[in-house]
């Protein structure tokens, strides 16, 4: 069951009450990390209850610890030793036995027990938490006090993760949105408003909702919201193996958050492949291997890249991602991101990318790239949105829809700049605005 507005408001108020003097920028890493560990603990407990059939995990572990941990790793991708579950921290607090070293030991052991095939999914995922950090307090006692407050907060009924995946994902999505709102300059760039995500996702999946296999790719994955929203419109998204989630992220914080976000939506680690690297540097996934151009292709590609970013465009003319179209200027990487996405699109796939309006009229190399895309009939539609939809920038943006093997030469322009509601300093798309945009594009 989805969280009510009242529950969300209470949750955020409780969180602010417990953080004390810690800045939200630092606090978010601990809240997300500990919440995710709680999720993994409860998932492991649920799995153990099903396989042990009344036996005690500590007893099984004591008989053959290596075998026990390997069995858990084989099934979950990770393993948790006895007495190192989230509830064990809470029990230690309740009996005055807690110390911050318990958490340090837990995460050290967790990192040692990641399955080889799950390394990309779990490795470094808790690195945002430093238990010796001065952000938490001047001494071990002060830092332990902060951790106790967090653990007790996340043990409250408001943060109960024992319900459906919808409840778990709702909690996580709400917190991501709240932190992105409050920390707009820090996190806003990694968060795409839900309404724009829905527009893109519905266009990308229209007529393909029943596909048994579907691969999606976001090369600037941020919090992972575009991947998740796109998948939510696929009828078989709840079945393991149907959808393969690929993404890439340069910055460490969203790299961690995106993996947490996907898994807390119930997606198994072996359906997730998120890479930590600069998308505009060496190509991924696959790309040129042993001198041969062999990019991995996807059914749907979506992106909300940093707008008009600077990049190193030197000696890029022979890179297969840009060779046919040209190289973007070093002060504006917008078309570099677009062409990277197009390069990884299946011949019958669809892509949607959010860009500043400047890509529609700037000249020089960008004008030549734009002309090449139009001459190849690869731009299907351009949707112009109102200003102030995004948390980190007031500028208006557009969504460009592309297909590779398109025959029609026309380009649909949708002016959606007038349909919105104003909420404080931000503009928001209403449900009727989303419907009108989607209907215009797909019909």
Model regions and ranges:
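Conserved hydrophobic/aromatic pocket- or pore-lining residues that grip, position, or stack substrates
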Residues: 171, 200, 219-222, 230, ...
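S-adenosyl-L-methionine
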Residues: 257-293
